[in-house]
């Protein structure tokens, strides 16, 4: 029987077109195009965040359902973007808990949904239970989440360069914040920085070398680190730089 115009319209209205589904029918993962947001966010703006008064108040079990008694987050990917490198950390270090910290709401929503989808897809193995994403402003609230000497590694990959001189104070690496990072890093802990902007790289190196609690790894030490090869294109931003044949500027620092 041929559908009349009214019947065809009803059928069309009752159908949910796949194009409106934010989850891919093929991979089961969220589709990035439904979570697009401007590339950067003003970290000084008065965003509305719920944050704990102290690290002991953080409900880590809500983010890591399989967390063990006494287990703590060891790695922090600050400004994790769409979570590509965070996922890599979860795969490389299955016994460690890694957190991605992202200020942009849609982007952090994407990472949360991505992690949830990966957990569902790997329910039989329990993979990706060791990664999570938190929407927050790391420039303001880092000590609210981590206790003294808790973190083993921190990552600052392709941060906002804030090109204008008046906005340099917004850069994620500056003297005041370096002291906070030193507080939450254990002695011997590592800070990984990567950018495709040479001016920002020089800024990072200068500020970290001037700080008394950090020393830069030698080129040999950096190249021997198994994480180093992953820094170039595990993140979405890094992969874009590779596609565009851009430059990468790497510097890794040890907490003294």
Curated annotation (Swiss-Prot):
Pathways per UniProt: tRNA modification; N(7)-methylguanine-tRNA biosynthesis
Gene3D superfamilies: Vaccinia Virus protein VP39
PROSITE patterns: SAM_MT_TRMB
SUPFAM superfamilies according to UniProt: S-adenosyl-L-methionine-dependent methyltransferases (SSF53335)
Residue span of region Disordered: 1-25
Catalytic activity, EC: 2.1.1.33
Stored HAMAP family: tRNA_methyltr_TrmB_euk
Single GO molecular function: tRNA (guanine(46)-N7)-methyltransferase activity
Similarity comment: Belongs to the class I-like SAM-binding methyltransferase superfamily. TrmB family.
Entry keyword Amino-acid biosynthesis: no
InterPro entries listed in its UniProt record: SAM-dependent_MTases_sf (IPR029063), Trm8_euk (IPR025763), tRNA_(Gua-N-7)_MeTrfase_Trmb (IPR003358)
Catalytic activity: guanosine(46) in tRNA + S-adenosyl-L-methionine = N(7)-methylguanosine(46) in tRNA + S-adenosyl-L-homocysteine
UniProt keyword terms in alphabetical order: Methyltransferase, Nucleus, RNA-binding, S-adenosyl-L-methionine, Transferase, tRNA processing, tRNA-binding
GO cellular component, one term: tRNA (m7G46) methyltransferase complex
Places the protein is found: Nucleus
Name by which UniProt lists this protein: tRNA (guanine-N(7)-)-methyltransferase
UniProt entry tagged with the keyword Metal-binding: no
Entry function: Catalyzes the formation of N(7)-methylguanine at position 46 (m7G46) in tRNA.
Binding site for S-adenosyl-L-methionine: 79, 102-103, 137-138, 157, 235-237
Residues annotated as catalytic: 160
Disulfide topology: none
